[in-house]
């Protein structure tokens, strides 16, 4: 009887661990927002504003070659 209880315990722990990992993965979603879309991007301002407002990472990225860069902020949703 002890062998059945021990193996059942380990199976339940394995199932519980898998569900815990799945829930954690769902919570790690990342969002992206364009900050001040019409304004030219200053890299230092972009980084500081994104971190202060969203606790994220800001980068100046041009949507197409030849266009001015926009401040793209990536943060946890």
Swiss-Prot record:
Keywords: Antimicrobial, Disulfide bond, Fungicide, Plant defense, Secreted, Signal. GO terms for cellular component: extracellular region. The keyword Iron does not apply. It is found in: Secreted. GO terms for biological process: defense response to fungus; killing of cells of another organism. Residues 1-27 form the signal peptide. InterPro entries: DEFL. Disulfide bonds join 31-77, 41-60, 46-71, 50-73. Pfam families: SLR1-BP. Belongs to the DEFL family. This is Putative defensin-like protein 157.
